[in-house]
C-alpha cells in the first residue's frame, strides 16, 4: 500500500510537472515572438494561454495591430451576416485582425445540411444586401463561393461553402477598411 501511495504521489507530481513544463514552453514561445518582432522597433505582447493566440503590436510609427487566432469571439453582428441556422462554430477556426482602421474577421461553421441548401441561404442573404454593390457567385460541384464587394464602403463579405462528409463546412470572412 505504501508503494502504491508513493507511485500515485509520483504520478501526480509528474503530471504537475507536465503542466509546469507546458506553461514554461508557452511563455518561452511568447517571448521569442515578442523578441523577434522588437528587432524592427515593433513592441509586441503575445498571449498563448487561452487555447489560441492573442497578439497586440505597436510599430515604430505608433500604428497598433491586434490579432486573435483560434478562439476569437465573433458574432453575427461583427460579421454583418447571420450564421446558418443550426450550424456550429468549428473549433479553432475564428480569427480577428484589427490594424489601424482596417479589420478582418474569419469564422468557420459546420452544418449537417447539404452544401446546396447552405449556399442558397447565403446567396439569398447576400442578394438582399447587394444593391449598389458587386455580387460574385461561383458554384462548383462541392459547394459555392459567394463574395459581396462594396467599393464605396471599402468592405467585402465572402462565404465559402464546401461539402464535408454528409454535411457542409462554411467559412465566412468580412474585410473592412476604415472601420471604427
Identify the meaning behind each predicted range.
Residues 1-5:
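Bacterial N-terminal signal peptides that target proteins for export
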Residues 18-180:
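An acidic-aromatic pocket/loop used at catalytic or ligand-binding sites
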Residues 13-16:
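C-terminal motif of bacterial Sec signal peptides marking the signal peptidase cleavage site
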